[in-house]
């Protein structure tokens, strides 16, 4: 009888110890899963933050456009607009077109073409300006800006069509100089308009007058 009692006590102790071990293992497994989940969540958040940063556009490519109202086109690279409630003259940044209205100067070849084309462009849609990092006005008080119609660069169009040359390049107002030079080279290679006459375009401007 005594042996039977001892055996029963031993069985009960074995069952109790087994149950405790099982609970301890389950707790460890649960803790392990919790730690793993936190680790995965942290990694996921870091990935998302990196992905968002990587997807943020570079500030250089961002345009801060200002809406203006056209008053009139003056020539190929100059217009008058209503800006901040007042009339202002805008001189196009980084380009030069043949003269048509410069005092004491003749009308130059393709000057009228550039003037006409510019007038068509600025009258064709929503007019906006973009300023660069440097001075917003030249020594004559004119606004210096990149000009857009319905989001498209007027300067680029004039350059691509051979009606303007890249000029007056002064840091830091050079945001689009690389693109403008590519546009100019494209027209030059195709010998469009101002590039169709050898020696007409120089580093100082244009040679010759309309006879």
UniProtKB/Swiss-Prot annotation:
Gene3D superfamilies: 2.40.50.90. SMART domains: SNc. SUPFAM superfamilies: Staphylococcal nuclease. Inhibited by aurintricalboxylic acid but not by Zn(2+). A lipid is attached at residue 20 (N-palmitoyl cysteine). Shows DNase activity on double strand DNA. This is Endonuclease YncB. It comes from Bacillus subtilis (strain 168). The lineage of its organism: Bacteria, Bacillati, Bacillota, Bacilli, Bacillales. The gene is yncB.
């Amino acid at each position: 009888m005594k042996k039977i009692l001892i055996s029963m006590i031993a069985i009960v102790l074995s069952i109790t110890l087994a149950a405790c071990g099982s609970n301890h293992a389950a707790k460890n497994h649960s803790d392990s899963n919790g730690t793993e989940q936190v680790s995965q969540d942290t990694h996921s958040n870091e990935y998302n933050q990196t992905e968002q940063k990587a997807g943020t556009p570079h500030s250089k490519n961002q345009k801060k456009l200002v809406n203006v109202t056209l008053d009139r086109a003056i020539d190929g690279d100059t217009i008058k607009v209503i800006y901040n409630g007042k009339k202002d003259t805008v001189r196009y940044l980084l380009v030069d077109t043949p003269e048509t209205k410069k005092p004491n100067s003749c009308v130059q070849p393709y000057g009228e073409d550039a003037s006409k084309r510019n007038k068509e462009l600025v009258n064709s849609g929503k007019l906006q300006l973009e300023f660069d990092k440097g001075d917003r006005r030249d020594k004559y008080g004119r606004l210096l800006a990149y000009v857009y119609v319905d989001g498209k660069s007027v300067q680029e169009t004039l350059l691509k069509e051979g009606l303007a040359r890249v000029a007056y390049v002064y840091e830091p107002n050079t945001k689009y100089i690389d693109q403008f030079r590519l546009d100019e080279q494209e027209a030059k290679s195709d010998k469009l308009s101002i590039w169709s006459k050898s020696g007409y375009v120089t580093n100082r401007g244009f040679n010759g007058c309309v006879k």
